[in-house]
């Protein structure tokens, strides 16, 4: 069993974006391929959780396994994606990453995983006062908590955190790099991110 593994969440319907965000172009490739490459600098075992409609297209861009949600929980949001990844790869800790935060640096995964220890169930950054539970790390033991929530038809990441012993990370190295955690949810945000990229 690996100590650490990565789960990339690329199964959302991207309704506000208008097309699958996982396949949006970024730095000459796609969001999902870019995220997998960045994560791959720190982690060897990575799985991508994809939606049925785009799974075959995602597989063309990444060299890691691409799976769908566990059938019984398909469509139940990020909790379903996380637990599906946990079932696919055995590890002590899982770094979670949505496919729509393309500014993330490989440094973040080093910082994140250095904070893990068995005293905690999760390590979650706080950026500008807001918890970021989808750019976080979760211990394997959280899997049973997720199953219990899904059985009760509860899908909120906040509900999961309320049941976990969480280490919140908000140090200077995180706050100084708040752009790592910016999500691209709309075409307008995508255009701004592309503009910022060209100005670097």
From Swiss-Prot:
Recorded family membership: Belongs to the MobA family.
Job of this protein: Transfers a GMP moiety from GTP to Mo-molybdopterin (Mo-MPT) cofactor (Moco or molybdenum cofactor) to form Mo-molybdopterin guanine dinucleotide (Mo-MGD) cofactor.
Name of the protein in question: Probable molybdenum cofactor guanylyltransferase
EC category name: transferase
Enzyme Commission designation: 2.7.7.77
Presence of the UniProt keyword GTP-binding in the record: yes
InterPro entries in the cross-refs: MobA-like_NTP_Trfase (IPR025877), Molybde_CF_guanTrfase (IPR013482), Nucleotide-diphossugar_trans (IPR029044)
A cellular-component GO term for this protein: cytoplasm
Species for this entry: Bacillus cereus (strain B4264)
Gene for this chain: mobA
Keywords: Cytoplasm, GTP-binding, Magnesium, Metal-binding, Molybdenum cofactor biosynthesis, Nucleotide-binding, Transferase
Lineage: Bacteria, Bacillati, Bacillota, Bacilli, Bacillales
